[in-house]
Amino acid sequence: MSRTLIKDALAAPAPADAILLQGWVRTRRDAKTFSFLELNDGSSLKGIQVIADSSLPNYATEIARAHTGASIEVRGKLVASQGQGQKWEVVAAEFKILGEADATYPLQKKGHTLEFLREIAHLRPRSNLFGAVFRVRSRLAFAVHQFVQNKSFLYVHTPIITASDAEGAGDMFRVTTLDLAHPPMTPEGEVDSAKDFFGKKTFLTVSGQLEAEIFATALSNVYTFGPTFRAENSNTSRHAAEFWMIEPEIAFCDLDGDMALAEEFVKYLIRDAKEHCAADLEFFSKFVDKELMARLDFVLEKPFVRCSYTEAIEILEKSGKAWEHPVSWGSNLQAEHERFLTEEQ
């Protein structure tokens, strides 16, 4: 018998006489003649209830040891649940412990802080928060490819180790195989990068833009989607040393076409997440950000405002605010200007 994912068991159209589930025990509670165990395999936020009767031959020797965190395999029947809030449950016919967890297992039913989860990094993917984050992230990554592939964009892989920089991309992480304690030196007293692995200075990429632009001049519409690294020691919610970035490059396209594609892309991802990750988004809305769903719906319902650079400067000059970075036509817009335009207008 092949394994059934719990998300598929929960969505089953009808009962099943035989089903095989594998996963980890989230909770258990014992009655006089049977035990209830919530089983989760990471395929969905919600687990499924397993009922283990004390008449099972290994109830006392094995099932009784299936504590929270234990890895188990269950064969049984998928039946309509007698309890509220769940459509199906599994009545176990066979029960096997694949990996035990003792009483010191740190993830319990109660909520845990991010600081606590950071201390148990090897187990935090089992938490509801991390499971939801990475299910949504996985779905969005798929939707990114789906959107651009449906528009006949070609996916190009650009170097992660490179000697190229990008305009305005920030500082770069150096990559070297030289002995940093005793590096080879030039006659001028500088580190001899010619002796390095590539014979020159190399870095982790800050952008695949340059390579993507080259491909766009031959393949028309291309995109990159991969890890990007910025050596900016800025400890803010808007900076990360490593993140994944999507960079489309479009031949024969003007700024209006580029903006229209960006708006369509963002709204496509939101709709896709709402359709395929509803339970995870509901979890975020309940426990992380109560305004999340309203904000997503606002983005979907409203057209993106187009504002020229000249119009933006005029709005900022007329605002009467005292800017840390003075505003004048020809100057670059800073974060404070962007926040004002997007949050206060």
Where are these regions (language model features)?
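Alpha-helix capping and helix-loop boundary segments enriched in small/acidic/polar residues
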Residues: 234-235, 253, 300-303
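Class II aminoacyl-tRNA synthetase-like tRNA-binding/catalytic domains
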Residues: 2-251
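Metal-assisted phosphate- and nucleotidyl-transfer catalytic regions
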Residues: 165-192, 264-345
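Short amphipathic alpha-helical segments with coiled-coil-like heptad repeat character
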Residues: 32-33, 212, 256-257, 320-322
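Catalytic cores of large soluble enzymes that bind and process phosphate-bearing ligands
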Residues: 132-136, 254-261, 304
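His/Asp/Glu-rich mid-to-C-terminal helical/loop segments that flank catalytic regions of hydrolases
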Residues: 217-219, 254-275
